[in-house]
Amino acid sequence: MTTMDTQQRIKQQVESHPVVLFMKGTPQFPQCGFSALAVQVLNACGVKEFATVNVLADAEIREGIKQYANWPTIPQLYVNGEFVGGSDIVREMYESGELQKLLEQTSQKA
């Protein structure tokens, strides 16, 4: 069970950055194929900067993020404070062009 403090920390991260990816590892060294795919998709969309949270570095965040969005898997992408989805949804949205449209609404796209 995660504490309210953990949920507050997650909320603060999500609301403080236009694009946030909760992932296993880092963009330079992703620790799972799904996290690597999410990073590749964001890069392919031309996102210059996005915040990342390595859930492997914090067990409370790793469990808390699953409760925060009621989504059982990682990675999780948030854009403008809203949960977008995991790697499958992110990939599908990229392939359909929906993700690019959503990301254009942030200031992080050139």
Per-range role (PLM):
Residues 11-49:
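Local sequence-structure signature of Cys/Sec-based thiol-disulfide redox active-site neighborhoods
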Residues 79-109:
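Non-catalytic, surface beta->alpha helical segment in thiol-disulfide oxidoreductase systems
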Residues 47-62:
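Thiol-based oxidoreductase modules, predominantly thioredoxin-like and allied folds used
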Residues 3-7, 58-62, 96:
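Structural motif corresponding to alpha-helix initiation and N-cap regions
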Residues 67-73:
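Thiol/disulfide oxidoreductase modules built on the thioredoxin-like
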Residues 1-20, 110:
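N-terminal leader/targeting and pre-domain segments
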Residues 22, 76-80:
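Acidic beta-strand-to-loop metal/phosphate-binding motif
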